[in-house]
């Protein structure tokens, strides 16, 4: 199951995000996620297996011009993460699908994904 995160989920997201992003402390992530959620430009989606959070995605709205798009705002996938032991099971695809649907519900026509 993938669910759209709420403010009560900030610590859960930070505990996953610290495994992906280079930060000094988990509190730094908690503060950033809290600030993002307060602006309402960010959406987070959490993948659960049974009751264990195993992955997440963060989407932001961008209002500046984004090459290749013809609308504003544009959804921007800031990051997607799945715990190593849960990879290769289609969970990232499931999280991405939920993120895309979350952007559609906000009338956002484009979701920008930059991957490496």
Show which residues each predicted segment covers:
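Conserved GNAT acetyl-CoA-binding A-motif
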Residues: 96, 103-115
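Conserved beta-strand in the GNAT
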Residues: 46, 52-61, 76, 81
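Active-site rim helix/loop that mediates acceptor-substrate recognition in acyltransferases
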Residues: 25-48, 58
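A short beta-loop-alpha structural element at the N-terminal edge
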Residues: 1-13
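Conserved acetyl-CoA pyrophosphate-binding loop and the N-cap/start of the following alpha-helix
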Residues: 86-98
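A conserved beta-turn-beta hairpin within the catalytic core of GNAT-like acetyltransferases
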Residues: 64-77, 87, 109
């Amino acid at each position: 199951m993938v669910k759209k995160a709420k403010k009560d989920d900030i610590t859960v997201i930070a505990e996953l995000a610290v495994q992906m992003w280079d930060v000094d402390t988990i509190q730094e992530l908690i503060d950033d996620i809290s600030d993002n959620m307060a602006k309402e430009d960010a959406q987070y989606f959490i993948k659960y297996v049974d009751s264990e959070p195993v992955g997440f995605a963060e989407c932001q709205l961008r209002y500046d011009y984004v090459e290749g798009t013809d609308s504003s705002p544009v959804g921007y996938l800031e990051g997607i993460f799945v715990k190593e032991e849960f990879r290769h099971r289609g969970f990232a695809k499931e999280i991405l699908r939920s993120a895309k649907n979350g952007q559609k519900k906000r009338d956002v026509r484009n979701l920008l994904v930059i991957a490496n």
